[in-house]
Every structure is written in structure tokens, then in C-alpha cells.
């Protein structure tokens, strides 16, 4: 199994267990990676840790529940693993920039974080227009990252 399949397996596991306690060690076991490795892959591919990904997904699904059910905010908070109403409201406000009560309104703007999928897209065979010219000396700065797509 290559790393993209493993990351997709991790995301599927998270989605299927989003209302339960999610153990990062179990995700590591499923993906045949260490907890540090799986976390590094999430950070390098999504820019957030796996715990942040889980929190963002839970808070996104909470919006759906707020707008489409009669569940109390407290019940939704506990459903998605928050220990208190206050911690849920604080995290909700941090992600969505509105309170859970305001988010009950379907016209309210929120920041939904969709489920992640990992794939490789290869585009090519396009005609490239170019021009060769002499330039003055200049410096180039950048950041390089190497990814091993094989386990």
C-alpha cells in the first residue's frame, strides 16, 4: 500500500468513527505508520496535525447537526467529543467565527472543512511557450520538500 492509500485509509477511519473517541495509535496501526510519521504526513499535505484535522471535521459536522436537527447544542458538543459546552463554543467560534446559536441559521456563513482525499494528478503534454534571454545576476530563494510516496 502506498502512502496516499494509507492517508485515505486514515481519513476513512476518521470519518467512520468521527462520533467516537479516535486513537491516533489505531490510525497509525491501520496505515502501517508510526504516530509521528502519520502526523508528519498530515502536516506536510494539509498543513495541520491529525488532531487538528479531526477537530475541524467534527466542528464542520456540528454545523450540519445544528442546522438540520433539533439536538441541543450541549448534546452536539458531547456527540463530537467535547468535554463541555464552553470548550465546544470556544472551538466553534475559533473555526467558524460565529457562535453555535448563530450557526443554526442556514444563511449564516461558516468555515466548513471537507473530508480530505489524497491523490496524484499528472498533467502534461501541453505545449510550452518560452523565450531565451539574458538576465542580470539575481538570487533565488525557496523551500524544498521531498516526499517518499512509497512505504
Where do the language-model regions lie?
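Short hydrophobic/aromatic patch on the recognition helix
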Residues: 38, 42, 87-88, 92
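…primarily DNA-binding HTH/wHTH and HhH modules…
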Residues: 1-5, 9-12, 90-138
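Short coil turns linking two alpha-helices in DNA-binding domains
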Residues: 31-35, 83-85
Amino acid at each position: 500500500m502506498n502512502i496516499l492509500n494509507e492517508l485515505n485509509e486514515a481519513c476513512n477511519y476518521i470519518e467512520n468513527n468521527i462520533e467516537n473517541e479516535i486513537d491516533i495509535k489505531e490510525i497509525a496501526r491501520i496505515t502501517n505508520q508510526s504516530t509521528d510519521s502519520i502526523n508528519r504526513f498530515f502536516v506536510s499535505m494539509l498543513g495541520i496535525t491529525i488532531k487538528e484535522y479531526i477537530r475541524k471535521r467534527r466542528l464542520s459536522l456540528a454545523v450540519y447537526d445544528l442546522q438540520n436537527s433539533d439536538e441541543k447544542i450541549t448534546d452536539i458538543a458531547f456527540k463530537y467529543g467535547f468535554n463541555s459546552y464552553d470548550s465546544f463554543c470556544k472551538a466553534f467560534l475559533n473555526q467558524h467565527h460565529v457562535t453555535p446559536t448563530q450557526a443554526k441559521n442556514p444563511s449564516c456563513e461558516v468555515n466548513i472543512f471537507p473530508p480530505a482525499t489524497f491523490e496524484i494528478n499528472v498533467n502534461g503534454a501541453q505545449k510550452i511557450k518560452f523565450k531565451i534571454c539574458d538576465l542580470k545576476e539575481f538570487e533565488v530563494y525557496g523551500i524544498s520538500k521531498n516526499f517518499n510516496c512509497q512505504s
